[in-house]
Amino acid sequence: MKATFGGGCFWCTEVIFQNTEGVTSVLPGYMGGHIDKPTYEQVCTGTTDHVEVVELEYDDELVNYEDLLKIFFKTHNPTTLNRQGNDVGTQYRSVVFYHNEEQQILAKNFIDELENEDVYEDPIVTAVEPAATFWLAEDYHHNYFNDHPENPFCSVVIAPKLQKFLKEFKA
């Protein structure tokens, strides 16, 4: 099964799903824009309309789509438009890209439940859009956290997020 999420910097999202049981592949890339084969530099200009995403392959006998949605919403801020923390731009917007009608329904229902339960103080701005062409990110973005733990962004932003995830979902 396939799932695609945009939740800010793909370095953050990638390592979370790499540590999720049942997820067999996590690839960083770009989706949702209007040019073919975008580069990181082009996407960062904010003019291509692409989102930094991770495309997952998962075994639905080990993890279901609702579990992936729960992880996605717990590990980023779905209430900030075009921003995650200090990362600002349309490439960081919160998006669930669905691959079939069931995923679309599950994502919309999940967001409705969060809104009805007042889980967040502010309204959820996460978009639910049909999956488009997935453009694989440049090689140096792959496995970024694990390959660059000394990078300040990794140690200050990603490591605490990963620890929080591991504490909550691996306990």
What are the language-model segments listed below?
Residues 1-171:
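Flexible coil/turn and secondary-structure edge motifs
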